[in-house]
Amino acid sequence: RYTGDSEDEIGVLGKSMNTLSEKLKETIGELKTANNELQKDIEEKIRIDEARKEFIANVSHELKTPIALIQGYAEGLTEGMAEDPESRDYYCEVIQDEAGKMNKMVKQLLTLTALEFGNDKPVMEQFDLVTLINGVLSSAKILLQQKGAQVFFDASEPVMVWADEFKIEEVVTNYLNNAMNHLDGEKRIEIRLEKNDKEVKVTVFNTGQNIPEEDLGKLWTKFYKVDKARTRAYGGSGIGLSIVKAIMDSHNKACGVQNVKDGMEFWFTLDCSV
């Protein structure tokens, strides 16, 4: 770098070289920034492509069984294999049940995709969490009775929170469904609220088998199933907990799971309303 103050030709040349050097440095910096951005774009494209391939593979795998069953039973009806009304009714029930499972999975996938891509942002409002939970329990009353579940939720005072009421209802519903589907032993479900000045923690406990510690973190991954046979039996898709995680991420709040004595606990936190 030229540091002189001469006004002759050497001085002018030196100052010109300084200016050129600064411009070159600035241009190189811009090129590095552009290159970094391009690299990020390439990595993001690769990530999206891999996610797309994984998504297609998973969806294809999940749809394979219900489509095969629907096709098989439909062909059975067409070929007259169900000769009596009782058999025909059974064939139709299987077809309707499998179609319902596919419909449920597609709806869950649409919900999850919208959440993951930020197209379904939470609409924040103040509401009573206790009223919401009681509403979910009331809606699930018949299912709980069919499972022979004992449900304990003794919160009586309102607990006001700040969140998207519709989405939190979906979180509670998914946790409750998960508890019902993995209920065992005493068949007890407990919902507990722990509140401090800033947050409330909601915990849903169910008696049943523990999950291997190495599998706990995978539960939030879409299509992941610890017990595939059992999940298939109750019509699960392995998407419900992924939706929970996406909803809590959109609220910038935490959720988790842990093994406890005689069962499992799933939890999430919300901001208390001022």
Tell me what each language-model feature is.
Residues 1-56, 74-78, 93, 222, ...:
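Membrane-proximal HAMP signal-relay module
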Residues 3-5, 123-128, 145, 150-159:
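Conserved catalytic submotifs in the C-terminal HATPase_c
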Residues 4, 93, 157-162, 166, ...:
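A short, conserved loop immediately preceding a beta-strand within the C-terminal catalytic
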Residues 29, 97-105:
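Short alpha-helical segment of the dimerization/phosphotransfer core of two-component systems
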Residues 117-122, 160-163:
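Conserved micro-motifs of the catalytic ATP-binding
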Residues 179-180:
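Short helix-loop "hinge" at the ATP-lid/N-box region of the Bergerat-fold HATPase_c
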Residues 186-198:
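Short beta-strand/loop element within the Bergerat-fold HATPase_c
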Residues 211-225:
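Short conserved segment of the HATPase_c
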